[in-house]
């Protein structure tokens, strides 16, 4: 396998008729180590890597990670996600593979449904698939720890917790200085947080003005500061940040404890409302013994979700 320090091409911009550049035209050096290319979300090394590995391998692993590749054009643009339709749930499932040591568990919204008496009406049957070896997974986490310490996710780093992950930004077709989609995905050994920011349809009236390193990262940090205190707080014991391994110190300002407490207060309010929703849901499900009542229960759920 490749070393996390492997130097990748950061200069080739033309592959036949396909032209590519780094976001905002950034090009620091002709080559960059792989850990830096990933942490800084550089386009040129990603496309160069896809070109070296071959599109068959790229598509094979896209499918292994649960992505629908059937209608995606077989071009190098796929290295940047072009043509791949996905959502936060699918991406949480994919990145959960790294958090689980290379094993992907199928994502689901409901683990089980109980009635008001506590009886289980329906439960989810977990399916697990090994996608990567443990050693490969460790290398990926080594590099993705750098996203939050030195890369495009420094503004998303939560207080008191170490996360690994990736950011992503798509340019609009009508203005390269504007963006249509912004992703921030982070994980610990306990949890994956997958966030997308954008509009259902991007056009000249609906767009974002910065990259995922800006507003999207600030939102992610608030969410992470709220969620992580309720996890086990498991550390990445078997891996080390690739930047630290190369003697490079973290950059950016660390989130303060005050910020974390404010975010946690917001989450407590959400948690209380969610608990009330669960109690109401149990009652609605227990009473939904005929089609008409079942429909009322479903309408109640849709109302909570804002549909």
List each model region and its residues:
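Sec/Tat-exported extracytoplasmic proteins
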Residues: 1, 12, 38-42, 49-53, ...
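Conserved catalytic neighborhood of penicillin-recognizing serine enzymes
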Residues: 2-58, 119-146
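A penicillin-recognizing enzyme superfamily signal
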Residues: 3-4, 86-250
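Mid-domain, small-residue-enriched loop/turn segments at the edges of structured enzyme/sensor domains
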Residues: 19-26, 54-93
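Periplasmic/cell-envelope proteins involved in peptidoglycan metabolism and beta-lactam response
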Residues: 62, 299, 303-307
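Amphipathic alpha-helical membrane/lipid-surface binding segments
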Residues: 263-301
């Amino acid at each position: 396998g490749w070393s996390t320090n492997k130097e990748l091409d950061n200069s080739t911009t033309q592959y036949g008729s396909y032209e590519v550049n780094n976001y905002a035209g950034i090009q620091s050096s002709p080559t960059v180590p792989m850990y830096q290319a990933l942490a800084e979300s550089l386009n040129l090394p990603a496309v160069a890597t896809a070109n070296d590995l071959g599109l068959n391998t790229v598509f094979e692993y896209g499918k292994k990670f649960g992505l629908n590749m059937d209608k995606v054009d077989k071009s190098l643009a796929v290295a940047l996600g072009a043509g791949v339709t996905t959502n936060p749930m699918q991406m949480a499932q994919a990145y959960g593979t790294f958090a689980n040591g290379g094993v992907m568990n199928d994502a689901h919204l409901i683990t089980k449904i109980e009635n008001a008496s506590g009886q289980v009406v329906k439960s989810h049957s977990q399916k697990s698939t090994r996608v990567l070896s443990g050693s490969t997974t460790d290398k990926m986490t080594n590099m993705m720890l750098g996203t939050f310490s030195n890369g495009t996710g420094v503004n998303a780093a939560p207080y008191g917790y170490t996360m690994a992950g990736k950011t992503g930004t798509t340019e609009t077709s009508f203005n390269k200085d504007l963006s249509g989609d912004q992703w921030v995905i982070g994980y610990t050994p306990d949890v994956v947080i997958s966030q997308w920011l954008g509009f259902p349809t991007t056009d000249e009236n609906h767009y974002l003005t910065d990259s995922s390193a800006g507003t999207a990262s600030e939102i992610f940090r608030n969410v992470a500061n709220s969620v992580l205190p309720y996890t086990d707080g498991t550390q990445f014991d078997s891996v080390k940040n690739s930047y630290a391994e190369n003697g490079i110190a973290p950059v950016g300002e660390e989130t303060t404890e005050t910020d974390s407490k404010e975010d946690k207060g917001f989450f407590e309010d959400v948690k209380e409302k969610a608990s009330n929703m669960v109690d109401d849901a149990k009652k609605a499900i227990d009473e939904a013994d005929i089609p008409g009542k079942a429909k009322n229960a479903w309408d109640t759920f849709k109302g909570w979700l804002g549909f």
